[in-house]
């Protein structure tokens, strides 16, 4: 993702042919590391292709994916509502465990300093 973002930033800034050095400079300017293999793979995949063409193809693929994934989104949305109800029970059990541990750590002093 860093490589793609750096490439698009270079293109948006007016650099018609960003080089490997340009991408490294952009990524390293924000303190991130970049993998040379990923850069090489990226440039081999986009060789002789236009960015707007690549974006258009990507949009078409995303549109095709989103039309088939509607049922999954609905199913996962319903399951998300049950999670908060289960969470307080786990919090309560953790509190009980902590209280139990504290009482055991008294060393027989029966909460002398509480």
Swiss-Prot record:
Presence of the UniProt keyword Transport in the record: no
One GO BP: cytoplasmic translational elongation
UniProt keyword annotation of Transport present: no
Modified residues (Phosphoserine): 103
Keywords noted in UniProt: Phosphoprotein, Ribonucleoprotein, Ribosomal protein
GO MF, one example: structural constituent of ribosome
InterPro entries for this protein: P1/P2_N_sf (IPR038716), Ribosomal_P1/P2 (IPR027534), Ribosomal_P2 (IPR044076)
Organism superkingdom: Eukaryota
GO cellular component, as recorded: cytosolic large ribosomal subunit; cytosolic ribosome
A UniProt-annotated Pfam family: Ribosomal_60s
Modification note: Phosphorylated.
Region of interest: Disordered: 74-114
Function field: Plays an important role in the elongation step of protein synthesis.
Family note: Belongs to the eukaryotic ribosomal protein P1/P2 family.
Subunit structure: P1 and P2 exist as dimers at the large ribosomal subunit.
Protein name per UniProt: Large ribosomal subunit protein P2v
Gene name of the encoded protein: RPP2E
